[in-house]
Amino acid sequence: MAEERSQRSRDRSREEKIDDGMIEKLVAVNRVSKTVKGGRQFTFTALTIVGNGEGSVGFGYGKAREVPVAIQKSMEYARKRMANVSLNNGTLWHPVKANHGAASVFMKPASEGTGVIAGGAMRAVLEAVGVKDVLAKAIGSRNPINLVRATLKGLEDMQSPTHIALKRGKNVRDFSHGS
């Protein structure tokens, strides 16, 4: 019972499903100040992830004087910039390395029932895209924006064996292990 409650509260923490079936996740909110003649002016930035849980995902970064407006802007931007990712029954096709700036990510497929073993910003992207089982590690910078970009870059660069076979003009069976 207690385990169920903790699981429920952890899932609810930064996730929201809307009418159109999209999964929205708030990754980070940051307060930025600008010093002017009359004092400090505060603005807020929001980093959000939007996905359909079936291979489509996008991220947005919004800025505004108030937090809700910044979140709304970033959600709209994320919906405009959706990318499609090829998945293999809820996991990845092959191990992937990608980086953006000093943030590097390493993701590898996991067997069914493993779950999403990833931290912070990477977890939000992987859950929104619909990955159920994956082992992931962030290396280098832990800047949320760069981690999100690196994770998306890795997922977009991943190719299914069928796609590789088509590109090379070969049969998929030629890529099986042990041949």
Curated annotation (Swiss-Prot):
GO molecular function: rRNA binding; structural constituent of ribosome
Domain S5 DRBM: 22-85
Entry keyword set: Ribonucleoprotein, Ribosomal protein, RNA-binding, rRNA-binding
PROSITE patterns hit by this protein: RIBOSOMAL_S5 (PS00585), S5_DSRBD (PS50881)
GO biological process: translation
A cellular component term, taken from the record's GO annotations: small ribosomal subunit
InterPro entries for this protein: Ribosomal_Su5_D2-typ_SF, Ribosomal_uS5, Ribosomal_uS5_bac-type, Ribosomal_uS5_C, Ribosomal_uS5_N, Ribosomal_uS5_N_CS, Ribsml_uS5_D2-typ_fold_subgr
Stated family: Belongs to the universal ribosomal protein uS5 family.
Record note on domains: The N-terminal domain interacts with the head of the 30S subunit; the C-terminal domain interacts with the body and contacts protein S4. The interaction surface between S4 and S5 is involved in control of translational fidelity.
Subunit structure: Part of the 30S ribosomal subunit. Contacts proteins S4 and S8.
Protein name: Small ribosomal subunit protein uS5
Source species of the chain: Xylella fastidiosa (strain M12)
